[in-house]
Each structure stands twice: as structure tokens, then as C-alpha cells.
């Protein structure tokens, strides 16, 4: 609805995003956003660059469109710009898909330098950036939680913002802010997917933003998430820091951990599930499984008490896992650059 788009454009301006209601399309959650952008822009054998590791829901969509996926490794302050430039010299992507704030699964945030650099490169090499933003409303430990889109003066960023993590997961609603020249294609794809996001959901969201103190609400959620995040980070460092490598998260609801070389996260998943803890094996977040020793823990729906319990169970059982699952030699193929 027009009213909701008006409210949302005000909200985005508050995040320093230069937009208006005509650039905003309302979508049924971020997954649909990725889907319609791909339908509108990606043809068979087009190249899409992604972070490694990345969100597997996006990988699946790119693959279903027949895209060729090229991965760029993540460093502690965002993706590896050196490797990105090497690949850009040789191959032209249609899109690069990124989560610049509190990346899923690593929790890493891009430095301001990298945010600006990525936009610079998109102009220089003429590709679009698909930004997936699910939780930049909060700052956690990050010095710059501004969306990449807020640095985008040249209309290179297609910006997807979902509200599931900050309102409620069952309410599949989000927005995609689309550069003018791409609007027709992407709007057509949205129309052919579901015509429009249910009116009732749009109206509820509009009333909520207009008549409730939306920013106050965000502040209260921020407190809850930040408390959980900081507690988990401290617990992981204290209890597991000397045994496992923990990715340098700056915030969010995910932590990405690394077992010693030669151990499998799939095996660890089975082992620790029997003890009552559920983790996500890292295999979900890679396009090519070179090495299955990473796993993710997600704290979105857990109470603080359960988080403490879960981490203690991992701490108490890790040595047992390591001795009983020694799994032969470590075969690691070298990365091949295209």
C-alpha cells in the first residue's frame, strides 16, 4: 500500500538511505526478495559472486536460476577485497550478494572502508550489489552498522530489508529498494510470484509503524538481543575459546565456530544432538565443501538460561568428541581461482 511505502521510506531515510516510496516494493520476507531479484535479473549461466561462507537460502535460489556461483572468502572486516579484485579482472558478475552487517553465519561486519570500496568497485566494473539486511537496526559491537545502501550514491545497490527478526518471524514482510533502471524487471517478477504481499499484513505493519512508537520498540528489542549476544560471546570465549576457533563476530544472532582440522561438523552435529544441543553444520553455508569443520550456533529463539546450558554441554563433551571421532587424515584441496 502507498501509505505503508510512505512510512517505510521515512524509516529508511532515518537509516541515511536516500530513497522515496516509488523505489520501494513490499515483499513477503527476505527470501522472496532474493527470489524476485534473481527472477528479474539472472539468466542461465550468469555469474553471481557470494561471500564464503554465506546464507544457503540464497545459494539455492541462485542455483535454481542456473547461475554460476563464485565465492569470495570472508576476512574479519568483510570480504577479501584483494581476491574480489582478482576475480573481477577476469570475470564479470551480474550481481554480488552480501550481508555487510552481522553476516550470516559469521556475525562479521564490514568496515566502513570496505563498504565504500565495494560500491566503488561496483561502479568501476559495472555490476549490481544485492544487500541482504536483517538486523542492522542494532549496533551490538559494531562501529558502523549503517546499511551499505546508505553509502550508495550511484544506484548500484539493490537493498533487501526484512522485518522478521525485529518484528516477528511469522510476519513475512520486508522491502526491496530497487534502482530505477531495474524496477520494471523486478516488479514483473514480484507480480508473477504472488501479485502482492497480503493486504492484511501490510495494513498491520502500517498501523504499527504509524500509531505505535516503532523506534522505542526497536530500542527494547535491541536491549534483549544485545544482552543475549554479549553473554553468548563471553561464554564462548571463556568456555570454548582455547579449544575452538570462534569467528570474529561483531553482532547479530549467529556465531560461527571451527573444529580442529580433520573433524567433521556433520559428525559433531549428530554427536551433540544426542546430548540435547542443536547446531547447524557448516556444510550448509558453502557452495563447495572443501572442508567440513565449521558449525553455527544461533541464539535467536533461545533463553539466556538455555544458551548457558547449551554452551556448557558443548564444553563438557568436546574432548570426548575429539577423541572418539579422530577421522583419519585431513584432505584439503587447494582453492582454485578462476
Language-model-derived ranges and their functions:
Residues 179-180, 210, 258-260, 300-302:
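Residue-level recognition of strand-loop junctions within catalytic nucleotide-signaling folds
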Residues 1-125, 136-138, 143-151, 305, ...:
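Conserved core of the PLP fold type I
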Residues 50, 71, 129-131, 205, ...:
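Hydrophobic residues in well-ordered beta-strands that form the structural core
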Residues 2, 223-233, 245-258, 268:
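Conserved glycine-rich beta-strand-loop-beta hairpin in the small C-terminal domain of fold type I
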Residues 263-268, 305-309:
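Short, conserved charged micro-motifs
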Residues 153-223, 323:
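Conserved core segment of the aminotransferase class I/II
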Residues 274, 287-338:
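PLP-dependent enzyme catalytic core of the Aspartate aminotransferase-like
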